[in-house]
Amino acid sequence: MDLYGTLGASCARREILTAMFQAGMTGARLNLSHTTLPECASLLEEEFWPAARQAGVEASLIVDLQGPELRVGRLEEPVPLREGGSALLGAGGIPVPRSVVEAARPGDQISLDDSALLLTVEEANPDCLTCRVERGGLLKSRKSLALLGREVDSPTLTAEDRANLAQAGRFGVTHVLQPFVRGREDLLTLRSALAELGLDRVKIMAKIENRRGMEKLDEILEEADVICIARGDLGNSMPLWELPSAQKRIARTCRAAGKPFFVVTQLLWSMEERAVPTR
């Protein structure tokens, strides 16, 4: 069994990473929705890989692309959203992809930061959305965004994704996580991009994050090397009580096909405040 951690500020030192490897971690994920591979050069070359060698672990380095995932743009500082208040998305307000503004209709709901915040669209204009805050909190840059119940057009790979893939060989990337896989074509696009860069040996991990991914699971299984059950956004696409059975259904299908899989999102989240994991 593999055990992956996520690289971040709290574990960005060689001694901490060495201890994590010694405790059983076999690889780490780097979220490229918030950074780039060149920006992480010192973390990878001076901390991560030396820690793996010191611990005697043949580690995996997984890069998590942005892909079709929707995110809030960059904010100069966090924006407080107060329950019952209003929020403007788009021109003159919180930056969001234009495709979201074009797809949204009054009454639609928008979840932010893996459902930590929830908005209802009250008015949809050509360049902005006026929303009511149903569940408030502090919104930070580049947090996830989902227009619930609607599909929003977005490319398999962004320009930033392709730039990061071009650096993957230099930094020893072993696996690529493709978010919001919608079917076979997304994975063929990624595999073609890797082949053009001479990265045929890099493994593809397909993230199942919505109902469309579940519906296309059989064809996704044929093209992916590994399946990732991403509970955060998957939970946004269905009522919460359906999530456990959906997770088990994907796992059962993977086992039947002999396809490796793993589960992510908030597995040890409760330990941010408690000494013993409850989730």
Task: Show which residues each predicted segment covers.
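Non-catalytic helical/linker scaffolds that mediate oligomerization, partner binding
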Residues: 1-279
